[in-house]
C-alpha cells in the first residue's frame, strides 16, 4: 500500500466519522427539542381552563316565573308577562314560560336550555352562554326589581330642537348627550401644528364628555337611571318622553320640552305607580353630573382662565369653585342652581325646588389639547315616589349674553322669589365698573348690534360715545394742558434767567405772575 492510498483511506475514515458525529448531535438536538415541545404542550394543556357543561338547576328554573313577574311587563289583566332583552325574549302565561335565548352565534329555545336537551351540534361555550343569559334574568331582578328588563338594549338617540338649539337625547340613561348652538361657531386650529382654522357649530356638550343621571337609594336597592335603556316617544315637535314601563303597570321616565326660540329645555321626571316600586323611605334623589369641557377658542389660556364651576346659594350671590388647579368643596346649604361655565357659553341646572346640598369638583386638563376642565357634581334633591312629577329642572344651554341671562328670571318660574343672578356668570369687573357696564356699556352695545353686524365698528362708535360723555369732565383738564404747552417757552426763559437754589423764590414768584 503506497503513501497516497493510505492518506486517502485515512481521509475517508475521518470524513465518515465526522458525518456520523454530526448526525448524532443533530438527532440529539431534535430529540431534546421534541421533549421540550411536549413538555410545553402538557403545561399549556394543564394551564388551559377546562370547559365544563353548565346547566340551570331545578331551583333556578322554578324561580324564573317569579322573576318575570317582578321584572317583566304585564300584558292585560291576567297572569301574562313578557321579559325582553337582547339576550332573552321570554313570555309567561299562567306560570308557563316560553321563549328564546340569544347567544353570540345562534338562537336557542328557552325550554331546551332549561331541560338541557340541546343538539349535539351546539358547542359547550354556546350552551354555557345560554345558561349565563338565563341566570342574568334572576340576578338582574334581584338587584333592580321591576327595572331589570331595561338593563340591556341597543344604544341610540332621539333628536329635539328649535331655531337656536339642537339636542340629541340618549336612550341609554335618558339624558341629553349632545347640545349644539346653531348661531355660534367655534374657532379652533385644525391641529396642534396648523395655522388653519376649523369652524363648526359650538357644542355645549358632546357624547362621551357630558353625562348626568339620577340615583335612588333604599335599604336594599340602589337604582341609577344610567343603567337602563329608555323607550323614546316623540310627543310633539317640542316634547320628547323617555320612559321605562314596569311589570305592574307603573311607569318612570323623563319629559323634555324645548320651546321655540329658547335656550332653556325643561326636564321633568315623570312617573306613575312608582310608590309600588320605590320604597316610601326613599325621600331624596341624587343628581350625578359630570362634564369634560371642550375648547371653542384658539387661545387656550384665556378660555381656561374664564371657565369653571359656578353655583348659587338660595338668598345669596353666585360663587365659583376656583378657576385654577384641582378644587373640591361640600356645599351644605340649599342651592338655587349649579352651572358649568365656558368662556362664552354655559350649561346651568336650575331645579324648581332647589338642591338641598351638593359635592362639587373641578380639575384642569392642561395636558389635553381638546379640553380645558373636568367638572363634576353630586347634588341632592327632594323626591317622592307618590308624586307624578317629583323633580323638574330647567337646563340653560346657551351664550353668556347679559340681556339673555337677565331675562331668564321671567322665563324660568321658581318655588321662591329669589333672583337667579345668572348675569354674574359674566365677569364685569369691580362693583363700580359693573354698574357702568350694566347701565351704559351693555345697553348701548346691544342697541347698536341690532342694526350693525360688525363688532369692530360697534366698538369704534362706542369709544366715541364714551368720549362724548366724558368730555365735560375732561374739558378743563385739556384746557389747562394746552395753556401749559403755550407757557412752556416763557417758563423755560425764567428758569434760565434765575438759575440756582438761591433764586428759587424769585423763579416761583415770576412763574406765578406769568
Language model features: what each stretch is:
Residues 8-20:
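Hydrophobic membrane-insertion alpha-helices, especially the h-region
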Residues 469-514:
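Membrane-interface amphipathic helices and adjacent TM-edge segments
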Residues 1-4:
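Positively charged n-region of N-terminal signal peptides that target proteins for export
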Residues 367, 398-455:
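Interfacial loop/helix-cap signal at membrane boundaries in integral membrane proteins
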Residues 27-42, 480-491:
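Alpha-helical transmembrane signal-anchor/signal-peptide segments
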Residues 56-421:
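Soluble non-transmembrane domains of integral membrane proteins
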Amino acid at each position: 500500500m503506497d503513501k497516497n492510498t493510505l492518506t486517502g483511506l485515512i481521509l475517508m475514515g475521518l470524513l465518515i466519522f465526522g458525518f456520523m458525529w454530526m448526525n448524532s448531535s443533530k438527532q440529539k438536538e431534535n430529540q431534546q427539542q421534541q421533549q421540550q415541545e411536549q413538555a410545553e404542550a402538557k403545561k399549556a394543556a394543564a394551564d388551559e381552563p377546562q370547559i365544563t357543561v353548565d346547566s340551570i338547576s331545578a331551583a333556578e328554573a322554578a324561580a324564573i316565573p317569579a322573576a318575570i313577574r317582578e321584572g317583566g311587563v304585564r300584558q292585560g289583566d291576567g297572569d301574562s308577562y313578557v321579559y325582553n332583552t337582547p339576550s332573552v325574549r321570554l313570555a309567561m302565561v299562567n306560570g308557563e314560560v316560553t321563549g328564546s335565548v340569544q347567544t353570540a352565534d345562534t338562537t336557542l329555545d328557552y325550554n331546551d336550555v332549561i331541560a338541557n336537551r340541546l343538539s349535539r351540534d351546539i358547542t359547550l361555550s354556546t350552551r354555557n352562554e345560554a345558561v349565563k343569559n338565563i341566570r342574568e334574568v334572576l340576578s338582574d331582578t334581584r338587584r333592580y326589581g321591576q327595572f331589570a328588563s331595561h338593563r340591556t338594549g341597543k344604544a341610540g338617540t332621539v333628536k329635539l330642537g328649535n331655531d337656536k338649539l339642537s339636542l340629541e337625547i340618549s336612550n341609554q340613561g335618558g339624558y341629553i348627550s349632545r347640545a349644539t348652538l346653531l348661531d355660534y361657531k367655534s374657532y379652533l386650529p385644525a391641529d396642534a401644528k396648523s395655522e388653519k382654522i376649523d369652524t363648526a357649530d359650538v357644542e355645549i356638550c358632546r357624547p362621551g364628555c357630558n353625562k348626568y343621571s339620577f340615583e335612588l337609594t333604599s335599604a336594599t336597592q340602589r337604582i341609577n337611571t344610567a343603567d337602563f335603556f329608555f323607550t323614546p316617544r316623540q310627543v310633539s315637535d317640542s316634547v320628547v318622553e323617555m320612559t321605562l314601563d314596569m311589570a305592574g303597570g307603573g311607569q318612570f321616565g323623563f319629559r323634555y320640552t324645548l320651546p321655540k326660540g329658547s335656550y332653556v329645555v325643561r326636564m321633568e321626571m315623570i312617573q306613575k305607580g312608582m310608590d309600588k316600586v320605590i320604597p316610601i323611605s326613599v325621600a331624596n334623589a341624587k343628581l350625578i353630573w359630570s362634564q369634560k369641557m371642550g375648547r371653542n377658542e384658539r387661545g387656550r389660556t384665556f378660555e381656561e382662565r374664564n371657565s369653571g364651576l359656578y353655583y348659587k346659594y338660595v338668598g345669596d350671590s353666585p360663587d365659583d369653585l376656583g378657576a385654577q388647579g384641582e378644587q373640591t368643596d361640600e356645599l351644605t346649604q340649599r342651592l338655587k342652581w349649579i352651572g358649568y361655565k365656558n368662556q362664552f357659553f354655559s350649561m346651568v341646572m336650575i331645579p324648581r325646588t332647589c338642591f338641598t346640598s351638593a359635592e362639587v369638583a373641578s380639575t384642569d386638563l392642561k395636558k389635553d389639547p381638546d379640553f380645558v376642565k373636568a367638572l363634576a357634581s353630586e347634588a341632592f334633591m327632594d323626591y317622592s315616589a307618590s308624586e307624578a312629577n317629583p323633580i323638574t329642572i330647567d337646563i340653560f344651554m346657551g351664550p353668556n349674553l347679559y340681556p339673555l341671562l337677565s331675562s331668564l328670571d321671567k322665563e324660568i318660574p321658581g318655588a321662591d322669589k329669589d333672583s337667579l343672578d345668572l348675569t354674574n356668570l359674566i365677569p364685569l369687573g369691580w362693583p363700580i365698573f359693573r354698574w357702568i357696564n350694566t347701565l351704559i356699556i351693555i345697553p348701548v352695545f346691544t342697541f347698536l348690534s341690532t342694526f350693525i353686524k360688525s363688532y369692530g365698528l360697534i366698538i369704534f362708535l362706542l369709544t366715541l360715545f364714551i368720549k362724548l360723555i366724558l368730555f365735560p369732565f375732561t374739558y378743563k383738564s385739556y384746557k389747562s394742558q394746552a395753556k401749559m404747552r403755550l407757557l412752556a417757552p416763557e417758563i423755560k426763559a425764567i428758569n434760565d434767567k434765575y438759575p440756582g437754589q438761591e433764586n428759587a423764590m424769585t423763579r416761583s414768584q415770576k412763574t406765578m405772575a406769568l
